[in-house]
Amino acid sequence: MNFLRGVMGGQSAGPQHTEAETIQKLCDRVASSTLLDDRRNAVRALKSLSKKYRLEVGIQAMEHLIHVLQTDRSDSEIIAYALDTLYNIISNDEEEELEENSTRQSEDLGSQFTEIFIKQPENVTLLLSLLEEFDFHVRWPGVRLLTSLLKQLGPPVQQIILVSPMGVSRLMDLLADSREIIRNDGVLLLQALTRSNGAIQKIVAFENAFERLLDIITEEGNSDGGIVVEDCLILLQNLLKTNNSNQNFFKEGSYIQRMKPWFEVGEENSGWSAQKVTNLHLMLQLVRVLVSPTNPPGATSSCQKAMFQCGLLQQLCTILMATGIPADILTETINTVSEVIRGCQVNQDYFASVNAPSNPPRPAIVVLLMSMVNERQPFVLRCAVLYCFQCFLYKNEKGQGEIVATLLPSTIDATGNSVSAGQLLCGGLFSTDSLSNWCAAVALAHALQGNATQKEQLLRVQLATSIGNPPVSLLQQCTNILSQGSKIQTRVGLLMLLCTWLSNCPIAVTHFLHNSANVPFLTGQIAENLGEEEQLVQGLCALLLGISIYFNDNSLENYTKEKLKQLIEKRIGKENFIEKLGFISKHELYSRASQKPQPNFPSPEYMIFDHEFTKLVKELEGVITKAIYKSSEEDKKEEEVKKTLEQHDNIVTHYKNMIREQDLQLEELKQQVSTLKCQNEQLQTAVTQQASQIQQHKDQYNLLKVQLGKDNHHQGSHGDGAQVNGIQPEEISRLREEIEELKSQQALLQGQLAEKDSLIENLKSSQASGMSEQASATCPPRDPEQVAELKQELTALKSQLCSQSLEITRLQTENCELLQRAETLAKSVPVEGESEHVSAAKTTDVEGRLSALLQETKELKNEIKALSEERTAIQKQLDSSNSTIAILQTEKDKLDLEVTDSKKEQDDLLVLLADQDQKILSLKSKLKDLGHPVEEEDESGDQEDDDDEIDDGDKDQDI
């Protein structure tokens, strides 16, 4: 407290002493009065004094005010006065002091009083509990006080809230408050709470903050809303920026789709309010947070795809091509579109198809390039267009080819009715504006980045300099302008273009060296002792000459690697050359450009280096330095080693391709096996259905048998009078004929059964022979399992067939028994001595029963015939199943042979790869002995790839 009293020590003592006594008396009343009204009035008086006499009230009353919060929670009025007083003490928002240093002193007071307040973490917990009160006069001052604490000392207050039970959840309830002022101040509170604290950001996000904030933005009118929309957008940025977990949660929650209505602008775009411009600017920044190049590539790619699928990219392109858009919004929209399409092939293809609403329509890329090479356009807009063009070409070989194609003679519009991207780049490259030269050179370099094919294609470009003079190549024209001594920005841009063009392209190096004036110009530039401004150009010239040495294929006799190194040693000196080469990476603007891809410069004179070029310098600086110090013998040995390694790589690639082909063949064979299994299952299903049908016929036959037995019983009991009228012998003879027919059918069925038995014996013998052959053959581990499955299926089919045969035999036996009973009935002798009347009655009854018996016998014959036909159909299906099994056995034998051959080929490949690895190790050891560095990571990566392929081969053999 003594320290706090010393802050205001320079003030006069008279009136302040009186006020200090008043404050002391009020504090005594708050502490000692037993009446609630007295305490309330005292706290209200302290509140009125707290703004003007902040220091005195803070020193004397803070403890008493905290005690009031603890003991008088039942009275909302005194709680509200106490919270307002504490807010006035801690907050720096409202000041009435007029001294010069009042602002600095008030900030110190606020942080010091905040430190005193949070020294006891229970005070913050008490404040959080007060926020649960629904009373407006308690909740709103509590929100303001907690916000002020977070602004003064954010990290310690955040930590206290984080460890407090349900602390963050209580604050999230503020967003659902129906009173707008509390809800809006709750948004400000969450802004301060989530600033630079990833743990709290995650908790807030999982407390459904995204849903609530987006609802508020929609209710307020999206971009047409007021400052509440701005506050919500700032809070969303706090939650998403550099927080990969929340970004993934935002994408998977389908919240990206809800951003599309933000960018729906009408046809009338004039007269935008300042708040709308601010809101839309923050919305665009929020989109960029989700697709920032600094995010993990996988997360960025998924967000880019989601933005295309929901139409957000299309909406941004509409703003891009609209008229009447404010300049800063247009610039930020270009930057946003740039990062949405960067490295995403689908988005890049869509952007290439966008046309500007002009007559005739022009591609959006052409319209943007026209702005980039126009020196009257704002500098930030030109930088944004360059960034957009770079992002369009990033990892986009198709787009690179389309841009380079517009420079080739076959694609140039002879009528001159339309302007192509290539023509605009050439126009900017040879313009009198140095910034246009730099932008066009960097843009063209990005069209060649990592694309050897387009580097060779660009060598075909011919330029007509003037009427009557022959055309010159683009490469030659660049070197001509370089030698004319133009502005530094122009020369730096051309040198970056040439370095990108010649790197990893020996053909371009040959074309460059073919002009005899280029090498003397470079050596002359490097050898001179110039000022600091020219040192950067000297470093770039040294880099270009080093690239011409490192990527030289020695096709030009006068400019081989050895002769160029001798020239450097003679005219420049190796140490001097390496020193000049090091000027590039030591430059201040080089380190600034290497930090992020976006070309963001405060003014045009800082626009020197490109981000992708800094990566190229980092890659080539070391290898060029080593190449300069190498002798000719080392170069020859290195070339031999490179050739050997290339041959080895070709061999390994060839065998890898062979192994891949064999893997594909094995996969096809596996698919065939699975198809045959499916067919076998279908056959089993058919057999099951047939078995069920046989069971049905068997049941019907049993029913007929029972009925026939009853009829025979009645016929035996009444057969005594059959002979009286002479009818019984005729009927018996007819029955015997029917029985003979049944016997013939039985014989036919027995013959078919014998054929089936012989077929089963043949199948058993073939199965035994197949098992012996399979036992002697060497098959992959999985083939015996497949064969065993097929055998089990065959055994099941045979068992079903045997059961069906037994059932047919049983039916035949029962049929024979019925025939024997019929014959017994036919042989029975009638009894004499009955009267004619009784005989006539019995004869009539027997005739009726006999006719019924004949009818039943006829139906039985029909059923037996149907069973015979059904059995024949089953026999045919079984024959087809046997043929299918034979085909499967044949296919399996073929698979055995093919897998055996594949195993032998893979064994040969493994032996060959082992020999090649041994050769590589010996070559590496020789290289190390010669002092040549060996890239361990690449080689280990290749070895891992080889090991992976060998492991895959072993797995296939296991299959």
UniProtKB/Swiss-Prot annotation:
SUPFAM superfamilies, per the entry: ARM repeat
Alphabetized Gene3D superfamilies for the sequence: Leucine-rich Repeat Variant
Modified how: Phosphorylated in a cell cycle-specific manner; phosphorylated in interphase but not in mitotic cells. Dephosphorylated protein associates with the Golgi membrane; phosphorylation promostes dissociation.
ARM repeat ranges per the UniProt record: 20-60, 61-121, 123-163, 166-207, 208-253, 255-310, 311-354, 363-408, 420-459, 473-513, 518-571, 573-630
PROSITE patterns per the UniProt record, alphabetical: ARM_REPEAT
GO biological processes: endoplasmic reticulum to Golgi vesicle-mediated transport; Golgi organization; intracellular protein transport; regulation of cellular response to insulin stimulus; secretory granule localization; small GTPase-mediated signal transduction; vesicle fusion with Golgi apparatus
Start-end of Acidic residues biased regions: 935-959
A GO term from the CC aspect: Golgi membrane
Protein keywords: Acetylation, Coiled coil, Cytoplasm, ER-Golgi transport, Golgi apparatus, Membrane, Phosphoprotein, Protein transport, Repeat, Transport
Entries under Pfam families matching the protein: Arm_vescicular, Uso1_p115_C, Uso1_p115_head
Localization: Cytoplasm, Cytosol; Golgi apparatus membrane
Region ranges (Disordered): 925-959
Oligomer and partners: Homodimer. Dimerizes by parallel association of the tails, resulting in an elongated structure with two globular head domains side by side, and a long rod-like tail structure. Interacts with MIF.
Task of the protein: General vesicular transport factor required for intercisternal transport in the Golgi stack; it is required for transcytotic fusion and/or subsequent binding of the vesicles to the target membrane. May well act as a vesicular anchor by interacting with the target membrane and holding the vesicular and target membranes in proximity.
Protein name (Swiss-Prot/TrEMBL): General vesicular transport factor p115
Protein source organism: Mus musculus
